[in-house]
Amino acid sequence: MDAKLLLLPFPSPPATLHHHPPPPKSLFLGASLPLLHPPPPLRLLRPGAPRRLAVVAQAAVKRRKEIPFDNVIQRDKKLKLVLKLRNILVSNPDRVMSLRDLGRFRRDLGLTRKRRLIALLKRFPGVFEVVEEGVYSLRFRLTPAAERLYLDELHLKNESEGLAVTKLRKLLMMSQDKRILIEKIAHLKNDLGLPPEFRDTICLRYPQYFRVVQMDRGPGLELTHWDPELAVSAAEVAEEENRAREEQERNLIIDRPLKFNRVKLPQGLKLSRGEARRVAQFKEMPYISPYSDFSHLRSGSAEKEKHACGVVHEILSLTLEKRTLVDHLTHFREEFRFSQSLRGMLIRHPDMFYVSLKGDRDSVFLREAYKNSQLVEKSKLVLLKEKMRALVAVPRFPRRGVPATSEEADRTNGAAQMLSEGSDVEDDEDEGLSDMEDLISEISGGKSDTDYHWGDGWVGENDDSPPDFEDDDGSSLKEVKVTMKKTANSANGKAHVPVFPDGRPRERW
């Protein structure tokens, strides 16, 4: 008997239950992913059709580190800190400031941790001196030599006002619209040797050359008179001098055309054969004056890069030390139509520029203006800055009885010679000092906050306890003297031999 399957009806839900509609489906956010769509069909090329190859942009020249240029940045680390301290000090009446007020400028000095400011000031005895006025009142001021340097700097900048006006005119003549924001010019204030108050003095005294106009983003400086005699770049002047020198030397050499293009590279620059070929091809291009109209040049073209290199070359020629920060040049992208990769463009032309990565921000040097870390031609302001650097290098505790090395002897002799003549310096308040903590640690002997006894020195503006002038250096010298004395006594004495009480020698274990 076949078994029959009985299908029973499913019991209906009770009448009291309510049917709810199903919840809406959530939106699938991956619907637009390219992996979900089928790839386009491959199109076969016709026989003989040209194939398009992908071109990968690469830097023309690889950057190479050069120690002489990096040493220029390294030796100015302490000088930049001292100049920041000096700028804060000279903003006060009579150029005298209390240590309590100086504690409010820790962030401006790049000090994120608490340091003994008095110990920092005493590390530069040639620049600052700490004096006590009243009970628990400590103030600091410039030394007579540093005071004389500062006054000489102000006097020299006032005398060279005509040269500063010429630099501003040449800078405006190179711009596209012949106008530049004053805020952008302020970034190059120290590099060009402009006085601190140039906005209220130079910009308003010479309406026959330029005037202050209101722009979309603030006041700007606009050119009012074009002088064709100023529209000659430093590269053109150098080319004329080289051509005249070659004319004089041609009488000693057989006058015949060269069979190959000769590339003259600066001393110390080493390039591969391919890099030298690209540098030679760029040099063979016609020179484009930075003062010519460049509105028709297409961005990204070789002609535009030739013009941009000429503009950077001319700006660096106008600076005092023939160098500046790369960030300062990037502020003028709109005025000179610089490319977004300005740093890469400078690296691609090592025969003209050198980009140093030392410090917190990159610096660019005009290569032809330097020889072994030294400027070929130094202005009076640069000489005053070197005298200030000699003051910064004056040691706090000169070593006695120890023959100085040749480097220390040269530095000491140079400092003595420079101090006898008087001096000055240009400040550099725009340059980055985020690595100032490392410099302070080096100056203060690597001591952190916990290494100091905060009850003996200034901690902040609310600390009323007097500082201790006898810092760690004095105690360390005393310990060294005691140790040397003990060592000398032990060396002069006889060796101790173990004996019995009656004087008989005892065997050693």
From Swiss-Prot:
Question: What cellular-component terms does GO give this entry?
Answer: chloroplast
Biological process per Gene Ontology, one example term = Group II intron splicing
Keywords, alphabetical: Chloroplast, mRNA processing, mRNA splicing, Plastid, RNA-binding, Transit peptide
Q: Name one GO molecular function term.
A: mRNA binding
Mark out the transit peptide: 1-56
Feature: compositional bias, Acidic residues: 461-474
Q: Can you say what this protein is called?
A: Protein WHAT'S THIS FACTOR 1 homolog, chloroplastic
- Look up and give the organism this protein is from: Oryza sativa subsp. japonica (Rice)
